[in-house]
């Protein structure tokens, strides 16, 4: 629950006007991923949700790769704020 609270604070504070930015999209994907993982802990055989989770993970991965190539400083800050692992493929 603490992670969800910190994400909501970040989204309200920084991205109120700029909803199309890469950071805001990654933030929304992270919210969806955390919500789906908690759902899948209860419903292990929900294969459609698993497929949706994999799609969202792929989209977030591509956006993070783009952000790491274009804006390395913003990428590092976002990784720290959202507490996401830094992948080595970027």
From Swiss-Prot:
An example of a Gene Ontology cellular component annotation for this protein is: ribosome
Gene Ontology MF term list: structural constituent of ribosome
Q: Which InterPro entries match?
A: Ribosomal_uS15, Ribosomal_uS15_bac-type, uS15_NS1_RNA-bd_sf
Keyword Plastid recorded: yes
Q: Which cysteines are joined by disulfide bonds?
A: none
Q: What is its main location?
A: plastid
Q: Which SUPFAM superfamilies match?
A: S15/NS1 RNA-binding domain
Quaternary context: Part of the 30S ribosomal subunit.
Q: What is this protein called?
A: Small ribosomal subunit protein uS15c
Organism whose genome encodes this protein: Cuscuta reflexa
